[in-house]
Amino acid sequence: MSDQESASLREEKNEIINGMGSGAPSDEEEGEDVFDSSEEEEEDDEDEARKISEGFIVNDEDEDEDEDDENVADKKKKRRHKRRAREEEDDRLSEDDLDLLMENAGVKRPTTEGSSGGKLKRLKRVGDEVESGAADREQESSQEKESSRLNDFFSDDEDEEPYDEENRERSRGSREYDRGESNHQGDNRKSGMLDELDDFIEEDEFSDEDEETRQQRLLERKMMREQRMKAPTKITGLSSDKIDEMYDVFGDGHDYDWALEIENEELEGGDINEQSEEFDEETGMTKSSKKKISLQDIYDLQDLKKNLMTDEDMLIRKTDIPERYQELRSGLVNHGNLSDNDQELEKNWISEKIAVDKNFSADYDLTEFKEAVGNAIKFITKENLEVPFIYAYRRNYISSRERDGFLLTEDDLWEIVHLDIEFQSIINKRDYVKRFYSELGISDPLVDEYFKNQSTGSVAELNSLQDIYNYLEFKYAQEINDNLQKESDKSGKKHLKNSNYEKFKSSALYKVIEAVGVSADQIGNNISSQHQIHIPKDHEALKPLELIELVLNENAGDLQVFLSNIKLAMDTIQKYYSWEISKNTKVREKVRADFYRYYLVDVVLTTKGKREIQRGSLYEDIKYAINRTPLHFRREPEIFLKMLEAESLNLMTLKLHMSSQKQYVDHLFQIALETTNTSDLAIEWNNFRKAAFTQAIEKIFNDIAQEIKDDLEKTCQKLVCKVVRHKFMTKLDQAPYVPDLKDPKLPKILTLTCGQGRFGSDAIIAAYVNRKGEFVRDFKITENPFDRSNPDKFEEVFEDIVQTCQITAIGINGPNPKTQKLFKKLIEVIHKKNLVDSKGTHIPIIYVEDEIAIRYQNSERAAQEFPNKPPYVKYCIALARYMHSPLMEYANLSPEELKSLSIHPFQSFLSPEYLNRAIETAFVDIVNLVGVEVNKATDNSYYASVLRFVSGFGKRKAIDFLESLQRLNEPLLARQQLITHNILHKVIFMNSAGFLYISWSKKRQRYEDLEHDQLDSTRIHPEDYHLATKVAADALEYDPDTIAEKEENGTMSEFIEFLREDPNRRSKLESLNLESYAEELEKNTGQRKLNNLNTIVLELLDGFEELRNDFHIMQSEEVFSSLTGETDKTLFKGCVIPVRVERFWHNDIVCVTNSEVECIVNAQRHLGAQVRRPPNEIYELNKTYPAKVIFIDYPNITAEVSLLEHDVKNEYNPLTYSKDPAIWDLKQELEDSEEEKKVTMAESRAKRTHRVINHPYYFPFNGKQAEDYLRSKERGDFVIRQSSRGDDHLAITWKLDKDLFQHVDIQELEKENPLALGKVLVVEGQRYHDLDQIIVEYLQNKIRLLNELTSNEKFKAGTKKEVVKFIEDYSKVNPKKSVYYFSLNYENPGWFYLIFKLNAESKLYIWNVKLTHTGFFLVNYNYPTVIQLCNGFKTLLKSSNTRNRSGYR
């Protein structure tokens, strides 16, 4: 094995020990063309690929070293050109691919060799040509200048400079031709288009030029640029003075041209390192004269990351693989390069995972299902097709042939995408373990048998592979050390393993294990076969202790430590014997299989959990959970995630065990190690073996329990992720709001909010948004809609707004229930004033979901869009936009805003990774269902936000796509231009083309002869265009000869036009027998296209028909929750809530909750009726009382409540979980309840009568309760409480920092009685007259001094250990400087540490500083300020040093 392979193995080993290793894929791996099977470059081995990916130059010094210098230079030149050619070829279509694309698009591609090259020109109308001539000349100049703009870093030109240079030459010629031949431009456009398409694959006109010629060409090009830069700048409408002033402020846009010029030259000639190589004749080596300049040399790396412009980002942009796949596979090596056997294993492995949730019957034949899964895997891994494409255009390959059979859903496909990554990790680890085993040069029957079984059976799991690896490390530590020793001799580094087991194995004590009578391997065989193949043999004469004594006596010199402690020797032998058993893979495999099959989960409460988990707690439903099975967690995955969360908070521990676990262990012992003899000798040896075996099994149980917890957590995260994803999809899956479904035009919208609802003092804000979603204007309605003195004024203003803007829909929402009052008023005005649309229908008014508007009104995006508008105007704009498109509104939220959405109650249990997955996959599915209009996205950043979710795209590719479109400087006319203009490459085009559409109606008005423009506005994929034309021809019932003629002439698209114009097209299309047509097509071509045919028929009837659900109108319960913030968990019938008395109405009482829900207390629901007194004599205004909810009126946002004592005491708390004794520990619950009652009674007995002090800061707390109360408060907050020292003491508890509180004692003197407040209060020897004086003169001074110190630059936050480490590190970096910092003393609240070092060599000193109400006390002196404290410290230090020096003299 080579040194390089050994080094690689060592690196992989370090990664594998802690899980699957990760490594960045090379450029060739990431950028390999999946359609190109060419392997011309056989000399480029893996080492070269890796070096290239790392940015190094491959020096082929080992090839042809005997050739002369000239041959070496020629070879390098040829190799550079060959690499450039190959890089261009990888991203371009082959001739066959282009022919196929043109054929599917209905364009017949000529084969003549003299066709002109260049990009597809914009088609012009005849009337526009003369006007465009001058514009073209100006455009040429502006485009050349544009090349130096910073945003062109995203340009595709970086990778295709030779191609662009050639295009510039051709473009210049084309423009000159256009100016000179304008009279001939009305000729056959179709022919011209075909000529240009024919030259899509460029020929490298510089392929044969030598280095000197190339340098000359670059020099000429540079001179041309300099001439252009020297030319005077003309800007229409600006004088030269204004232009100069503008340049002074903004620059001329060429500040970074030096870097771009170098980069352009690099791209022109390939790798800049290669370009700058010089051949040294003396050494025979190449030397580099320049350093490659990248974007990181110009911009800050953080800015590049923020704008997705790092080298990794640019690589993802250019690699012709879907961006989401690249991100998922970034940690894998050689993804997709599986053997045929591994591919079959992957299909079976993933099929088993997916089938779990399909509920197939036990006798269901999975053959067809596995075939469908295999097809999906092939599409994902081999063809790099994303889920939306597979589901839309390959559905017949992932479903049953039976009509009511299975179908792999989008959920299944996304799961397969991630399972493929997991499987690749398993295979990588398996291959590593195989190489590791092979390098050891040993043969272990157990390992050999394991890999033999894995090659013929199902794939190994990571856990079993880890077992093999751990087994090898444990058993063959010496061989590993020998191998490492050989490598260290070569590299000079030593990383040898220190194995205690090897030391024990070489000692005399190991003889006792050999005498046990059955080895670990034999135990593994017995357990694996469930039969005692190897029968244990007891020692002939000696018991275990006797044998140990004998061994110790015979080896007293080596084992002296055990002579006086034979028990230690016994324990040591049993420990290592148990290790041998626990590392045996057969034992672990059997125990793991049984444990996974029969395990149960119990909750074991901690003391903290018993105390804190009470009724109403989040963890109430799992407090006494027992015997929970895997099936329970699959049905309710959130339960296990909740358990893990509670465990992390130290509220409980999870105990995983097998049912009848003790009996199981006894059974294994009987078949593996127990002898049937009944003699005392046999009993002793059986006891010895069982003790060791029990230790081994317990160790295995613990390991497997942790494995199960990890696996179960991942499984439950996936299941909850699916639930959250579906819930979020319901939010996205809404069509725009349309008042009249028969006339589906977007409405002109007026949205309103009344803010806090203070009518008459606060204005009502409204915003008008037109049909295009553009904000037009806002309105501020100051008139009070409920003004009784002038009720018509508001109505007139509102009517005028509606009539002026011609509003067709009204939306409303707000932050409180006052909005409902306005809503009812607006309905009244609409009917009273008869405000109707053009069809005479009353203008609808609806509540609009405002979760996005709430986030938008104060967002950075809103500030950029509408910097001068108040928040409520922005709120209304967002409401209107939501009515136009909920999808667009959600898509424009930032990642942080998306995560803050309340999607589902269980989303808090998801890790950020799974939450992001749920959100992104939901976006991808819905966006591709809707489609994206390409030209609209080009100049509308709001609309373009959905591009990143198009199949094959991502954030980076969406940016690249938009910049490529913008460089065209003209609308895209056909999908085929995405290929012919080099905007997309093969794989991304295949993924995205069907979801990117071009509006045909607009295009037809300007461009009449472009082929297949009508199909470009449908969901029909370009690969099916030819099939669509045949469907149209069959529907029109043309004879085969006519169809064949048009097919031969390339005019099949005419059938589409004929069909569109046919008034009976629906009946003709629906009469087609698509099933038989699909069968015939599959028989002839092998393609399964039934679903595609159905799509073609639907799209020919109505291209990109709206497939989303109707806009969701908020129901009364949702409106109630939106305006009040209450949910069915916080406000429900039977619950008890606090209400504030607002007014009295006859014998009723009107109250209000904290959420402003109006509550009515009827006369029979309060004490007034019982004592026959009016309620205002019993209840006080503005006072809060507990009330029980009797009824909730959701439409009117009111409730009926009761203030009666017996109602309040009988609160209804519904039990939402099962207390079935089979899964709930009733016995433990009862015991804990009794214990809690005892503790409560003991505490109540110990408590004295609570003192009541008439002061706003006095609370009936003890010390712990005071700390808990202040924990969420700010620094400096405090409470006054009763002291534990007796009735003549009080205490102040105040907060110094997070989880840091000081308790200050107050002694009371001159008390009138034990419960009265003393007339004199003493704090730290200082006398005060009342509590307020203590607060002002003592406590507030301490708070001020605390804030002064903590805000000083010499204060360091953190623990003592952290501050000490910081000072030590600082001192090492600055060895000659002294350093000191203050930090909080968490062990003694009210004290600070003063930590300092004089220099790097001195010891670390820690002094204590006390915080007083007059300053800081340090070394017998009080310093009033922090500055004086620092100066005093320095003075003390200086005097201390002086004394030390004088003492040495």
Swiss-Prot record:
Keyword annotations from UniProtKB, A to Z? Chromosome, Nucleus, SH2 domain, Transcription
One annotated GO molecular function:
nucleosome binding
- Composition bias (Basic residues) maps to 75-84
Query: What species was this sequence derived from?
Result: Candida glabrata (strain ATCC 2001 / BCRC 20586 / JCM 3761 / NBRC 0622 / NRRL Y-65 / CBS 138) (Yeast)
Q: What protein does this entry describe?
A: Transcription elongation factor SPT6
SH2 domain boundaries: 1256-1353
Instruction: Give one GO biological process term.
Output: nucleosome assembly
Q: Does the keyword Cell membrane apply?
A: no
Read off the Gene3D superfamilies from this record: RuvA domain 2-like, SH2 domain, Spt6, Death-like domain, Spt6, helix-hairpin-helix domain, Tex N-terminal region-like, YqgF/RNase H-like domain
Region Disordered: which residues?
1-214
Query: Coiled coil: which residue ranges?
Result: none
The Swiss-Prot or TrEMBL record describes its family as follows: Belongs to the SPT6 family.
User: InterPro entries from the xrefs?
Assistant: RNaseH-like_sf, RuvA_2-like, SH2, SH2_dom_sf, Spt6-like_S1, Spt6_acidic_N_dom, Spt6_death-like, Spt6_HHH
User: By its UniProt entry, which Pfam families does this protein fall under?
Assistant: HHH_7, HTH_44, SH2_2, SPT6_acidic, Spt6_S1, Tex_central_region, YqgF
Spell out the Basic and acidic residues composition-biased ranges.
Answer: 134-149, 165-193
Where in the cell?
Nucleus; Chromosome
**What is this protein for, i.e. what is its function?**
Histone H3-H4 chaperone that plays a role in maintenance of chromatin structure during RNA polymerase II transcription elongation thereby repressing transcription initiation from cryptic promoters. Mediates the reassembly of nucleosomes onto the promoters of at least a selected set of genes during repression; the nucleosome reassembly is essential for transcriptional repression. Essential for viability.
Could you tell me which SMART domains the record lists for this protein? SH2 (SM00252), YqgFc (SM00732)
Kindly indicate whether the keyword GTP-binding belongs to this entry.
no
Compositional bias (Acidic residues) at which positions?
Answer: 26-47, 59-71, 88-100, 154-164, 195-212
One term under GO cellular component: transcription elongation factor complex
